[in-house]
Amino acid sequence: MTPTLTPPPETVAPPAADERCDRCNAAGKLRI
């Protein structure tokens, strides 16, 4: 259960990257 509670950074990286992309796109649209 310990490894399940603490997943590797790889599994946490993809979702975080998607959120960052969304924020970047939003910022780009606001700038445009």
Swiss-Prot record:
GO terms for biological process: antibiotic biosynthetic process. Keywords: Antibiotic biosynthesis. This is Calichemicin antitumor antibiotic biosynthesis protein. It comes from Micromonospora echinospora.
